[in-house]
């Protein structure tokens, strides 16, 4: 399970330090893709395989299922950690998440998310007021 929030900077070549605590569970190679809300989703290979199977099972006759599969899989790529603990974030993913300098890496349960600091701040400002309301709605899931 991934948790925590880490502040880092991405360099002009797209290299980003991945915190050791997260690397331990991600492994040496993992999958990054376009995430929702303007961030990147990062999955360990085992979790990616489970998700891939679920998404492949969606009915291809539904336009929304096809659209989501295209978006999700077309942005995906394998990332590896270098000797300095950095990953190279591909240009198309940096563009999707507006990663230019200051970056926030968060643990989000089964995945890691990578955000531009600006987007993360805006997301938190927007989401924080509804946190308790959402928690009340999720009570039905026996949390």
Curated annotation (Swiss-Prot):
Coiled coil: none
PROSITE patterns from the UniProt entry: SPOVT_ABRB
Alphabetic keyword roster: Cytoplasm, DNA-binding, Repeat, Transcription, Transcription regulation
Cited Pfam families: MraZ
Molecular-function GO terms, alphabetical: DNA-binding transcription factor activity; transcription cis-regulatory region binding
Main location: cytoplasm
Domain annotation SpoVT-AbrB: ranges: 5-47, 76-119
Subcellular location per the Swiss-Prot or TrEMBL entry: Cytoplasm, Nucleoid
GO annotation terms (biological process): negative regulation of DNA-templated transcription initiation
Gene Ontology CC terms, in alphabetical order: cytoplasm; nucleoid
NCBIfam families (alphabetical): division/cell wall cluster transcriptional repressor MraZ
Family affiliation: Belongs to the MraZ family.
Record's subunit section: Forms oligomers.
Name under which the protein is recorded: Transcriptional regulator MraZ
Top-level taxonomy: Bacteria, Bacillati, Bacillota, Clostridia, Eubacteriales
């Amino acid at each position: 399970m991934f948790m925590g929030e880490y502040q880092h900077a991405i360099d002009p070549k797209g290299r980003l330090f991945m915190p050791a605590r997260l690397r331990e569970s991600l492994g040496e190679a993992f999958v990054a893709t376009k995430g929702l809300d303007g961030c990147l989703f990062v999955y360990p290979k085992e979790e990616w395989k489970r998700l891939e199977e679920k998404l492949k099972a969606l009915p291809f006759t539904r336009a929304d299922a096809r659209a989501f599969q295209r978006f999700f899989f077309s942005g995906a790529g394998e990332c590896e950690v270098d000797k300095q603990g950095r990953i190279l974030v591909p240009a198309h993913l940096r563009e999707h998440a507006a990663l230019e300098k200051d970056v926030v890496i968060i643990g989000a349960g089964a995945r890691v998310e990578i955000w531009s600091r600006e987007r993360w701040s805006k997301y938190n400002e927007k989401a924080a007021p509804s946190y308790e309301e959402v928690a009340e709605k999720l009570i039905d899931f026996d949390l």
